UniProtKB/Swiss-Prot annotation:
GO molecular function, one term: DNA binding
Domain Helicase C-terminal per the UniProt entry, residue ranges: 430-583
Record motif Beta-hairpin, residues: 91-114
Organism: Colwellia psychrerythraea (strain 34H / ATCC BAA-681) (Vibrio psychroerythus)
Listed name of the protein: UvrABC system protein B
SUPFAM superfamilies, sorted: C-terminal UvrC-binding domain of UvrB, P-loop containing nucleoside triphosphate hydrolases
GO biological process annotation, one example: nucleotide-excision repair
Gene3D superfamilies assigned: 6.10.140.240, P-loop containing nucleotide triphosphate hydrolases, UVR domain
Amino acid sequence: MKKLTICSEYTPSGDQPTAIKQLLEGIESGLAHQTLLGVTGSGKTYTIANVIEKLNRPTMMLAPNKTLAAQLYGEMKEFFPDNAVEYFVSYYDYYQPEAYVPTTDTFIEKDASVNEHIEQMRLSATKALLERRDVIIIASVSAIYGLGDPDSYLKMMLHISRGDIINQRDILRRLAELQYTRNDVAFARATYRVRGDVIDIFPAESDRLALRVELFDEEIERISQFDPLTGQVERTLDRVTVYPKTHYATPKEKIIAAVDKIKIELKHRSQQLKDNNKLVEEQRLTQRTQFDIEMMTELGYCSGIENYSRYLSGREEGGAPPTLFDYLPDDGLLIIDESHVTVPQIGAMYKGDRSRKENLVEYGFRLPSALDNRPMKFEEFEAISPQTIYVSATPSKFELEKCGSDIAEQVVRPTGLLDPEIEVRPVETQVDDLLSEINKRLPLDERVLATTLTKRMAEDLTDYLYDHGIKARYLHSDVDTVERVEIIRDFRLGKFDVLVGINLLREGLDMPEVSLVAILDADKEGFLRSDRSLIQTIGRAARNLNGRAILYGDRITGSMRRAIDETERRRVKQHQYNLDNNITPQGVVRRITDVMGVGSYSDAKSLDKVAEANTNYHINQQAEEPLLTTSQIDTKIVELEKLMQGHAQNLEFEQAAAMRDKIAKLRIQQLST
């Protein structure tokens, strides 16, 4: 059995050895809750990695959002390259839940766009938990939402061993039950193809390798893993397990039992609605439910099958839904990163979901059992959680009350860096002042973070900076998951110099290149400008030797005062430690990696992303267009217009937009010649 083993050139230093020892002693003595209070840049992730290695238990790390989950995933994959580090976040790029608005009599159908890459990673995560112990799962709060029942999921697996006697048609029937589709032309994830006595299966949880099962008559003669692109066989296997396409795959007998219970509930609910003279609602509910029952009986699933999860998983009314936590072994370890944000999120999910579903039930769109398709309640989360370590630079009241004195403090950084210096400046000239500060840092190849209060302000500030020759982009909740990771990677690579955000430029973002954090409208009290938010945002500059923070405000609020005082307290302690140990502060150098496998760094031709509206720039000076004569410009514009029309006809709109931007640039050049 493989052990969790760190591969790193670093050794614990500063406050890290003390924190590691304290956390390990707490876990081994049976403490249910502990807190690691570590300042930004003090190496909290490395401390936790050491704790995980020493304990050697399956571990789940919860992050407050997808951006931080992706960063944690990248760091843990670096620390544990030989172990199973998996990623489990919501697989929706876009999600509109079904809802009913009684005031306008509007029903909104469920609409969603699933990211296949993330869906594959989710399936890979549960597979790793079921098959091995050297597992670290990096998850978002998506982990508390209902997932397929692990017992049903295990029963659905298809086990194939060399030498088994099995009919080819039986294998194909089982693959259909696992919701795999036959496709002899386009071989993709969760499909299979048949060529004579050879069955090729592309597992749903695999991102690269497919399976080949070769039969001789009715005996399985050979099982191999191969590259579906080249056809090259990687290795032969004695046995293999094929996992279902979805976590909601359910054995036929369970579906039949569930359908019987759904019919009983439908009959009871229909009578209730009739008795209350709600005939429209009764007719609507009967029609929708009967359709779902037919689909489940014939195909084994239906659209919105999760709304019948109470019956499919055999739970009692009001029982906690099966979640990712049910796949985690009993001796697992839970790490809640940036706990001051993550814990409140866990508590908030249930109530928002409940209010929407109550309308659907009341107006006949769903059976009352649909209320049990929900995220866990906070008390259910607490009951199922294994031993927990909360990680935060600014723990909230909840963590402090839960842990009491069981808090490991990590204030001194291994690099000797101090917290950033803080300066308060007036709001009136904040944008122009920020522009001048940015221009000071450009020659030094340093980056700048600016935080605003609204999305509109972030976009307007980005446009303003761009108009003044600054390469800037914005990052907020409208930017999709994978693109956020790409934006942060491009920022660190120097493809642009200023990143403008609202609430995403806070916890955990690890960008050592940032030397200035500018907080606009810092004197506007609220959750975006609370002392915790300010400390977290200021901390983004704590990994740079020249780190500074500018708070723009006409007055010093209570939150600003607390943030400034806490930062100063830490600076004094850090400075004293450096003096006592003769340490010279050193800037952090961190390799830039493509954690999600979504892009290439040297891709000078890569397309500008949507968040970069009306913007087109390249960092590579050699890649810039040479100056052309007027006739050359005319010829070039005609060529680009043809390309643009071609891309548009092929529905390649991003490429067409890139051509449009090049044409606009040439027209400007044309006017200036």
